Amino acid sequence: MDFVTAANEPVQPASTCAPQTVTTRVQTSSPFLTTGVDYAGPISLRLGPPRSKTTTKGNIAIFVCFVTKAVHTEVVTSLYTEAFLAALRRFIARRGKPMTICSVNGTNFQGAANELHAIYKMLQCTSQIATVQDFLATEECEWKFIPPHGPHFGGLWEAAVKSMKYHLRRTLGSQVATYEELCTLLAEIEACLNSRPLCALSDDPFNPTYLSPGHFLVGQPLTQLPAADFTDVKCNRLSRWQTYQQQLQQFWQRWSSNYLQSLQQHHRWQRTSPNLQSGYLVLLREDNTASLHWLTAVITDIHPGKDGIVRVVTLRTPKGTFKRSITKICPLPRANGEL
């Protein structure tokens, strides 16, 4: 191939097959024994009482368990090493001491905005890295960095950051929360993320239960105190506490809808997949569901079309039996690994 021809050929980046799943993600272990950590931010914080006009920039530290995909969040009020270590100490006190902590490399964000780049100055300063590693050494923890300019190596925690940050920004908008309000909101958002169904617990059609990250943390599904629905109420009619409840409900609606869509195969109209069968546990895509409440149902009958493809099913729920299009349900992976 001559030089002119070679110059006109599109240059493709090197690629290879995806690696096998990391061993630490498939071995039996306690939650957060191997943990990924990342920052989401910056986010505005109000100093003092709710009516105070003094604000500052804070960030959110997100810890993700490699095995259970459980999420833990902490508010970090500054970019100093001491603030990160304080968040790390709170995490260890509540979730237990991890054996390995993985994080991004600061050079991944060399070309990012100044605010985002400032978050990772801590990870680029040799003295600050030494401070954090000295603390981890006393706790017998190992800290690993992913390769520079390789953010896809941290896809596990990047997905958690994206899942929370996108909807949190849309929910808060221009409102500025106090430290206590943000901590409370993040704790309940954390419960939302940890309540998501992962798979069916059994193949018994009369036991429609699912497994969630919350089961690994508290041994049972996460629940929440009931609250009035403030989703469509104007903000000027709500108290400060009701506004917080509205933000949480709006986050739940947006995030749960997005999560249910991710469970459905986007290529369902272009590529055939095995027909659904009776006895499958599914999630219902319904509007205005309460926070941390996932509507489950069991397929009792299927209705194939003339081409033999199932597009309508009969479902059994605690409230009765009815038909639904398969576009309104999301099948969960079964106990035997099938979908």
Where are the model-predicted features located?
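Charged alpha-helix within mobile-element recombinases
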Residues: 1-5, 133-217
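Retroviral integrase
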Residues: 1-166, 223-229, 234-339
